[in-house]
Regions:
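Short glycine-aromatic motifs
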Residues: 55, 132-135, 139
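Conserved donor-binding loop and adjoining core beta-sheet/short helix segment
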Residues: 51-95
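Conserved catalytic-core motifs of GNAT/GCN5-like acyltransferases
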Residues: 136-149
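Short, flexible, glycine/charge-rich loop motifs used to bind or transfer phosphoryl groups or to couple energy/partner
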Residues: 47-48, 76-77, 108
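Short amphipathic alpha-helix that is part of the acyltransferase structural core
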Residues: 1-41
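Hydrophobic beta-strand residues in large extracellular and virion-surface proteins
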Residues: 58-60, 118, 146
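Acyl-donor binding region in acyl/amide transferases
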Residues: 82-133
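Active-site rim helix/loop that mediates acceptor-substrate recognition in acyltransferases
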Residues: 34-57
Length: 150
């Protein structure tokens, strides 16, 4: 895993890597069901959020500086006293080999920002890798996720 390096991309640098990042974001969006896409962000929405610092972009590059994995997060404020880093999109072509580096850079950012927890919704296939890094599945009897189109 030492051949990968993770970075938080600053808003002023988004334009420098956008042509490499946008297709990865779109690939991630393409995995979302059509019904859910109606209320989901577009790549342009994410770019605006990065510039407004409403969302964070993390990248993992290989030894040739090719972007292999991206992660997008936003900080949620719960009850105005607790910060939680919500991981809202992960995409790329090498999750298996470089997820640990993405975790390291995102977790370091979350701690600097005073977050007490990281939360993500992901595919079931991600579970084994996430569990090796200390993630736990949250199971509650009374929780459901519902959506209604208007």
């Amino acid at each position: 895993m030492g051949e990968y390096r993770g970075f938080l991309v600053l808003p002023k640098d988004i334009h420098r890597i956008w042509d490499h990042v946008e297709p990865l974001i779109q690939d991630g969006l393409d995995t979302i069901s059509e019904n859910d896409k109606l209320s989901y962000l577009t790549t342009d929405d994410y770019r605006a959020w990065f510039h407004d610092t409403m969302a964070q972009l993390f990248i993992v590059v290989d030894k040739d500086t090719k972007i292999r994995l991206i992660g997008i997060s936003e900080i949620g404020y719960h009850a105005e006293r607790t910060r939680v880093l919500h991981c809202i999109l992960i995409a790329g072509d090498n999750f298996k080999d470089c997820h640990q580096e993405l975790q390291n850079v995102a977790e370091a950012f979350a701690k600097r920002e005073g977050c007490v927890r990281m939360v993500l919704t992901g595919r079931k296939g991600m579970r084994p890798a996430l569990e090796t890094m200390g993630w736990q599945e949250i199971k509650t009897k009374h929780r459901i996720i519902m959506m209604k189109d208007l």
